[in-house]
């Protein structure tokens, strides 16, 4: 069950002509079926308990009794999830706009990777993202299971009597979500004087919406447990030090290691300076979830795209020459293209050992 839940984040991938992140489920349901399911009335019952939260950020512990009489919006996420990151501009804006009307927004941080269980990592990430609403740390998935949830991100809409009225899985449907908040506030008699216009803002970095029409590369895990399309000759040498090579040619969405790595369950760990990862991708944005293998270690790296520095195509975590430094365990935005999008070859070289690479995501 745990492995299935860990894999569920991959259900949220973008497809052309959809206004939301479509759900790519193991049952291979059609995109049309998933779209209809993404936002629908819920008969899920009463608000589940937060009593088994590991810790709380930005608030003392909250209970269902504390929230009675309030309209509550609960969002599940984990801080390296690109789909969750892209919802944040809306969620932050709703938390601010409707707070005085009685809306309580609660984030539930249910980790995917082991390093996301570290409360200090989560606290730092929430601060960097400007998140001031309450966050329940759900390291044991007690809240996740209480809601019967399976997705990052997921929204649950709770009325003032403590009943779950709606849910929405994935990105998109933001205006519909905001309208549902307003309807629940109106039912509680708390909607007076609210501006009729939906929230508006300009999102930046990994929080900016994906270019769905050009997104043809899926989230790809680097650890051996869920790795796909790995193309280094000989395949993965599981849990042992091994010298890998990049083949002369990669097909779209294939990736490979070069240098001495240990492929562990969640991540590939670099054992010697000069290790590389290559990925043939098709997307406007490329991100890599990675971090130093030891605290307070900084690992410099250099990025190339089709063999050259990215220049104006660099992401927010590198300069135009492709230079950057891994200093903490998080998602790094490495490529943000501004021109036409085509199949490109990404390569990252680490100038020192001691980095862990977990997953590629795209936008």
Name every feature range the model reports, one short phrase each.
Residues 164-185:
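Non-catalytic, surface beta->alpha helical segment in thiol-disulfide oxidoreductase systems
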Residues 120-158, 288:
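Short, internal strand/loop/helix patches
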Residues 51-72:
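A short beta-strand-turn-helix
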Residues 69-72, 101-104, 131-133, 160:
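Loop/turn elements at helix/coil->beta-strand transitions in domains of secreted/extracellular proteins
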Residues 85-129, 139-143, 299-301:
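Structural microenvironment flanking redox-active thiols in thiol-disulfide oxidoreductases
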Residues 2, 13-22, 26, 37-55, ...:
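Non-globular targeting/processing and membrane-anchoring segments
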Residues 156-166:
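Short, glycine-anchored, charge-dense loop/turn motifs used at functional sites
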Residues 75-81, 110:
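Aromatic-flanked redox-active Cys/Sec active sites in thiol-based oxidoreductases
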């Amino acid at each position: 069950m745990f492995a299935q839940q860990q894999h569920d984040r991959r259900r949220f991938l973008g497809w052309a002509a959809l206004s939301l992140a479509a759900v790519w489920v193991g049952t291979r349901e059609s995109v049309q079926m998933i779209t209809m399911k993404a936002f629908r009335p819920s008969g899920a019952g009463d608000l589940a308990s937060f009593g088994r939260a590991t810790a709380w950020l930005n608030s003392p512990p909250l209970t269902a009794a504390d929230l009675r009489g309030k309209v509550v919006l609960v969002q599940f996420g984990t801080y390296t999830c690109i789909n969750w990151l892209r919802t944040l501009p809306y969620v932050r804006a709703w938390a601010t706009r409707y707070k005085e009307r009685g809306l309580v927004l609660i984030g539930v941080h249910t980790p995917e990777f082991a390093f996301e269980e570290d409360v200090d990592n989560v606290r730092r990430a929430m601060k960097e993202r400007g998140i001031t609403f309450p966050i329940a740390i759900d390291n044991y998935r007690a809240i996740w299971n209480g809601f019967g949830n399976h997705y990052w991100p997921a929204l649950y809409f709770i009325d003032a009597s403590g009943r779950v009225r709606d849910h929405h899985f994935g990105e998109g449907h933001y205006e519909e979500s905001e309208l549902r908040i307003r309807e629940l506030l109106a039912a509680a008699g708390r909607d007076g004087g609210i501006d009729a216009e939906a929230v508006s803002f300009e999102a930046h970095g990994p929080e900016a919406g994906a270019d769905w029409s050009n997104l043809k590369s899926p989230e790809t895990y680097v650890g051996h447990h869920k790795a796909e399309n790995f193309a280094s000759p000989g395949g993965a040498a599981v849990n042992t030090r091994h010298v890998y090579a990049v083949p002369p040619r990669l097909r779209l969405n294939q990736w490979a290691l070069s240098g001495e790595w240990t492929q562990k369950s969640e991540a590939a760990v670099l054992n010697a300076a000069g290790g590389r990862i290559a990925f043939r991708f098709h997307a406007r944005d490329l991100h890599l979830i990675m971090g130093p293998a030891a605290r307070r270690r900084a690992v410099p790296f250099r990025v190339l795209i089709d063999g050259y520095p990215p220049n104006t195509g660099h992401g927010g975590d590198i300069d135009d020459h492709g230079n950057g430094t891994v200093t903490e365990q998080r998602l790094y935005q490495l490529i943000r293209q501004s021109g036409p999008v085509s199949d490109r070859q990404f390569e990252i070289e680490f100038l020192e050992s001691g980095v862990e690479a977990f997953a590629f995501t795209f936008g």
